[in-house]
């Protein structure tokens, strides 16, 4: 979000649900905006947001949700995909690097972007899914702030990748400082003001994909 695409897919998903009356337009939009502002400030409670954003997934049959998601991707996300981001992903693929998307956005929403970029490793917040239905609960730790580091470390261990030479990490958000500090090649992409200053202080590379 705001790195490979010019926008936030979690926020856009909420807007899409509102615009198509899958949720109560007024109350859901207000809360969606509130949570997004908290995210930008770095004060978001990810578990609270999970309960809010996963609840609509419990209302519909899974196949209906898949249809909604497909329309959402084509209408909302596809126009936000950055050509330079596609070039960057292809550069790493051609370099035989192992790619992963690490995102606070839940896996149901972020999977369509991962599929578009043909990146098979997706580390995301996981909505609980039991007997073919979403329960509205969070499964495991949120993939947010320090939680991203935990998920990346587990992914490295589980995929026998501990002998890596470098880990490149691209992000726009100061919420990802912990993961930037963990990785050997942190790169700020069109960073927010806070991350921009931190990147300058740490002499981290800053690029634009816009």
Pin down the residues of each PLM region.
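C-terminal cap/substrate-recognition subdomain and adjoining C-terminal extension
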Residues: 67-70, 74-210
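Active-site neighborhood of HAD-like aspartate-dependent phosphohydrolases
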Residues: 1-41
């Amino acid at each position: 979000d705001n790195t490979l695409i010019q926008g936030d897919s979690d926020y856009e998903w909420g807007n899409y649900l509102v615009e198509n009356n899958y949720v109560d337009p007024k109350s859901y939009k207000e809360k969606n905006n509130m949570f997004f502002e908290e995210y930008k400030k770095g004060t978001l409670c990810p578990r609270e947001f999970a309960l809010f954003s996963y609840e609509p997934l419990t209302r519909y049959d899974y196949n209906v949700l898949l249809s909604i998601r497909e329309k959402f991707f084509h209408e909302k996300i596809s126009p936000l995909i950055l050509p330079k981001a596609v070039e960057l992903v292809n550069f790493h693929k051609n370099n035989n690097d192992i790619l992963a998307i690490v995102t606070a956005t839940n896996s149901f929403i972020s999977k369509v972007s991962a599929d578009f970029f043909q990146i098979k490793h997706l580390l995301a917040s996981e909505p609980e899914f039991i007997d073919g239905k979403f329960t509205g609960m969070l499964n495991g730790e949120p993939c947010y702030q320090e939680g991203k580091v935990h998920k990346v470390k587990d992914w490295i261990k589980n995929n026998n990748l501990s002998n890596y030479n470098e880990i490149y990490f691209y992000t726009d958000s100061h919420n990802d400082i912990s993961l930037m500090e963990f990785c050997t090649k942190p790169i700020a992409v069109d960073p927010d003001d806070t991350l921009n200053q931190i990147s300058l202080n740490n002499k981290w590379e800053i690029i634009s994909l816009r």
